[in-house]
Amino acid sequence: MRRGNGNFVFSGGFLSGTHFRAPNSVPATLSEKVYAGFKRDIVHGVFQPGESLSEKDLARRYGASRTPVREAAVRLQKDRLLRIVPNRGYFVAQITLQVLNDIYEFRTAVECASAELAAVKGASSQVIKELGNLAQVSCRPDDRGGCVRFIEADTAFHLGIASLTRNQMLYQAVNDARSQMERIMLAAIDIHYFGEVPKREHLDILCAIKDRDPERAHQTMHDHIMQSKDKVLGIAVVVPAHFARG
């Protein structure tokens, strides 16, 4: 595991070039930089759900003309992170109960299959060690920076498992869901402890993969995702201000 630009990066699997190579993490064009910055600001809560955003202000913020901002907005609408309302502007997408259910159903289908296939294909001791290091990262709810690092490590762990499948489509499917998942976790983590329990669950998943036990890998990933879903949906009911109905 290494860190670059403040982010955890899993260096095994796709990212090492052993199987498939992940998309370049460094945006190459101004349009990509605007998209990456805009997306990060939504995911990390700089822009709040439902907030109205001015194209002019966004162009100033990202040091670009309005054209790259428009291009980024179209992509973010496809990512379900932004709404474009004709003649009104841009609005940060709400995190609705429907979004929560959709993302967890998607993760259950895709990531359980990913863990199962990873156990079938196996991993080197170095990769297992690296994923184990990612699984050890935890945070306290009063440490915002630590929580962000925990969520980055969580993303790297799940992408690392997906990379072990040596299946580009599975990897991309897991990757596509992570922006929504990071956003959900950041919205929930302020009022719920996300530290030790996910660590134990991650280590259980990893142990099943190390033991080449696909059935157990599938089940432990399923249990992990369901535990996360129960926590977040519980928060959505108790503290509805964090999530919108719909």
Q: Where do the model's predicted regions map?
A:
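Short helix-capping and inter-helix turn/linker motifs at the boundaries of alpha-helical repeat units
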Residues: 29, 129, 193-196
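C-terminal regulatory/effector modules of DNA-binding transcriptional regulators
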Residues: 2-4, 191-246
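Short linear motifs at protein or domain termini
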Residues: 1-120, 233-246
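Mobile beta-alpha loop/short-helix "lid" or hinge segments that flank ligand
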Residues: 78, 82-83, 177-179, 194-196
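Conserved amphipathic alpha-helical segments that form helical-bundle/coiled-coil interaction surfaces
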Residues: 103, 107, 120-187, 199-208, ...
